[in-house]
Structures are given as C-alpha cells and as structure tokens.
Amino acid sequence: MAAPVASLNPALAGIDSLFSAFPSSSSLPLGVAYSGGADSTALLLAAAERWPGQVQAFHIHHGLQAAADDFVRVCESVCAKAGLPLHIVQVDARHASGESPEDAARRARYAALATAATARGMQGVLLGQHADDQVETMLLALSRGAGLPGLSAMPASFGRGGMVFYRPLLHIPSAVLREWLVEQPIEFVDDPTNTDERYTRNRIRARLLPALAQAFPQFHATFARSARHAAQAQAVLVEVAAQDLAVVGNPPAIKALQALSPPRQANVLRHWLLLQYATPSAAQLEQLLHQVAACTTRGHRIHLKVASGHVTRLGGSLCYSDAAARAC
C-alpha cells in the first residue's frame, strides 16, 4: 500500500484502515461507485489521493428521478477537475409487481457495477456507505425482527457478480465527510429522495438518529461494535451448520435431523435452504420444524412452501424443489 498522504479528507482514515492488510498489487486498480453525493465524493477524492492514476469513477444512472441528469452533470464536473475517468452506466431499475423498488434498484446497481468494473479491469469497487448507514441498517433489521444476519448489518467487504466490493467508511459519520467537503469547498448533490419520509430508512435518519446522537453521543461506535459481535456469532453458527449438515446429509435425513436439538435443527435447515438459494421466513422455518418432529411414520407427508419452491419428503429425507430447474 502507498505511504500515507497528508490530507484532511476523513475518508482517507477509513481507506487506510480497511486496506492496511492488502498489498496494492492485489487490490488495484479500483473503481468507486460515485453518485455525486457527499459521501461518495469524499471517498472518490480520498481514493484518488491515495492511489494516483489507479482509480476510476462509475456512476449508475437509474433513470428513476427527474434530477438524475443533474447528478451526472455534477459527477462530470468533479471528475474533470480532479482528472479522473468517469463511466456513466445506464440501468433499468424498474421493479416487478410486489417487489420493493429499493431492492430492485440495489440489485440492478450492484449487477451493473460488477459488469462495468470488470470490463475495465478493476480489481474491486469502493462503496460510500458510512457509519450512519450502518446504524440505519441495524435499526431497520431490529424493526423487522431480524436475526443475527440482519443485526450484523453491512460487511466491510463482500463479493458479488465476480467483483469484490469494499466499504471503507463504515466507521465514519456522514457529518464528518460533509463538513470536509463544505470546507474545501467541493461540489456535491443531495438526493431529494433522502428526505422522503414515506421510506422507513429516511424516517430513521430524520427522527431516530438525531435522538440517538443527543441521548448517546457515542452511538456510532457502540452500534458498530454490536454489529461486529453479531457478525462473529453468525460466523460461528454458519460453521456449526456446515458441520451438522455433513452429519445429517445433503439432502438432510429426517432421523438424523430429529437427533439434533430444535435450535440446531433450525440452524442446519436454514443453512441447507440457503445453499438452495431459498431464504425461509421465520414462520416457514417453524412450520418445517413441526413437520420434521411429526415424521414418526413412513406415511407422514411434507409439502411446505419456502421462498419460490417447496420442501417435500422423499423417502427418509427432505427435498427442496423450485421453478428454477432444481427438482427432487
């Protein structure tokens, strides 16, 4: 990694912390997901300062807002002044009936970033999510009754579509990044949808975060610590599930499942279903546990809806099949 460069940009601290374990030869060149907002602007300029000539900006144009073209103009202006390559990637983020618009846009964005960055030889993509985003994600998970995966919030790095994504700003509050940009001054845009309180995340941002800051000034650090604890505990559960799956078999043998405690049954069944690209709801998993417990005779049948498919009984084992050509 390059030697530290003197700079007041707080995003550099996050970059240095995340990338201290990576030799530059394995992580460069890098793309930055650049929306034109304050957070990604600070991240882009910090990355360009840390690795001159090794950073390119990627702007995803969803076409979902009237202001989208204004975002592009700001991105072009900032990148031109900084001498950075900018790639505008058009995506179709329309959502299907019954699908969350936010989820559809997020999936389209990551897929487009992975494809565009790979095509230009990037070894990774930096994302601008910060400490406030991490707290919002945890509070959203709590509001939905999430388990450890949800409470783990956002990981610092992950793979998708053959590309590695990094989040170096997860320990830096948004206000710190914004203050630095204003002091320079450096141009950025505010997404008007971020103040639309029809969205739960925006209500959390507008109402809960200010209250938390007043009552618990260190909440960014304490929430981040809780997320790390949850992630560590989840990692242990995944290890135990893999060990149990090796014992009960894949597909799982019903008698072997019944020999496990109910919590371990739930853990290994969730793990098995995730391997089939099926995410069971809490209610579906509870129903499946009841059915496994009731399998005391050969004639007991199981046919439960899980995600887009069904769990059935096939002889002495469970089987998952769905419309995506996975069949028992």
Swiss-Prot record:
Gene Ontology CC annotation, any one: cytoplasm
Positions with a binding annotation for ATP: 35-40
MF terms in GO: ATP binding; tRNA(Ile)-lysidine synthase activity
GO terms of biological process kind: tRNA modification
Entry domain remark: The N-terminal region contains the highly conserved SGGXDS motif, predicted to be a P-loop motif involved in ATP binding.
Family of the protein in this entry: Belongs to the tRNA(Ile)-lysidine synthase family.
UniProt protein name: tRNA(Ile)-lysidine synthase
Biological classification of the source: Bacteria, Pseudomonadati, Pseudomonadota, Betaproteobacteria, Burkholderiales
